[in-house]
Amino acid sequence: MARVMDPAGAAATDDRAIHKVPDPFPLTLAGMLAALGPQAINFGISIGGGEAYLLPNVSARGTLHMHWLMTISVVLETALVYECIKYSVCTGRSFFAATNDLKPFGFWPWFWAVVSIMTFAWPAWMGGAVIAAHRFTGIGNPPVLGLPPHYIWAVVALLAVLVVFYFSDRTYNFLSKFFTFIMFANIVLVLAVTIIAAKPHHYWQVLLGYLGITFALEGYPAALPKTDALALFNQPGGSLMWVSFWVIAAGFGMGKYAGQVTGVLKPPENITAQELRWNTADPGERRKMEQWVKLGGYSLILWWAIIGGLVMTYLYSVCGLAYLHEDFLKTGQIPSGVQVPIQMATIAQGVLGPMAGWLMLLIIMVTLYDAQFPIYDTFIGRTTCDAIAVSGRARRPYRFYYFVVVTAAVAAGFYLITVAQPFILWIGVAISALVYRSIGAWQILLLNNRRLPDGFKVSKLNSWLLWITVVTGFGGVGTWAVTVLPGEIAKRFGG
């Protein structure tokens, strides 16, 4: 019988069942398309707030000097997410459940549950979506109780989240199909608008920003708020460690045996929060697992890092520069308040006419709103339920706690949607995510080197990238907290 290390580090007899490693998809374009689901969701989370709120806003000022931060961010986040994918493919267990094995034992899953709720329960993405829905339809609620005219759309949107989750066959199946459609629709429309709107010098100017050449020649731009620059370092703002849930749900590697959340009309499945075992000594099994890991990594690099993280953020920046910058030079004004979420629709309408503006409003509405599904399902629901599961105190099926948590989070959204403008909320989420990325990088480095078999541990290159992630994330947010945050607080509260 095999022997493993228990969470406390003592040798223990491993009597878990040994599972066969499923046959992986081929490492071809067809295989990449078959493996698209997790990265389509990751893409949808990434191409949303930053692209609708931040990038056109920064480009409108012409302050592209710090776009090189996004290039570095894509590299660092790719290394982190790849290691999280590797762990979950090899174990069938999420990153968040795995942190239960890190000292202090039992603390970290609850840490992640609490900070996820505190950070992502604020409907920063949906706030922009409902503004777009109000503009798109012209339908709003009367100004009663001080509620904004788009509040009725928040009610519809939040109720739709619950309906989808309660009555889906499997929640992941809905997310995967929905986000795949949105991903390709977003790519086609933004590409069309960019080709028509932009001139060659716009492409070149943005490229110089991404490569850091503009910053090297001109230094830091005075017109760019330092908070926005820090938010750029979180772009394209992917799903970080939460991608581990989706590769499990997609059935990658040991994920095939892990169980999924089902709707209320289906019987609950047994969802494990423990590592699943496979024969690591069998060369054939190792080859299959290695291909699953490669598939997860290649899919991440193609769909999220290259297409989402580099190409799409580049196109959104070119659009903002090509259309909004000219108005900024004339008026000195940039979109603010409720105008921020719809600024890309403003670009489309100015370039292609009213019909395109309406279509872009629809795309903005959907691409911002779609983020709320995985935020409630995965960032809040699954993270919290994994904390409950690994505690050993669950007395009901995993799905019961999932629906309690998700329903409570959605109910809170009816109030939280009224608290602040979505761009302000999104900036707060972006800065918090830098801290979470740093903690996650440190934890996955420990987990993969301790828990995975030889040949699957963290490479030297990724070890360096993960440590750079830790240092730059904490360093950037710490510097901002000391030098910028006090002034922002004083400005906000008149101090």
Please annotate each region the language model reported.
Residues 178-181, 381, 395-403, 426-483:
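C-terminal membrane-solvent junction of multi-pass transporters and transport-like membrane proteins
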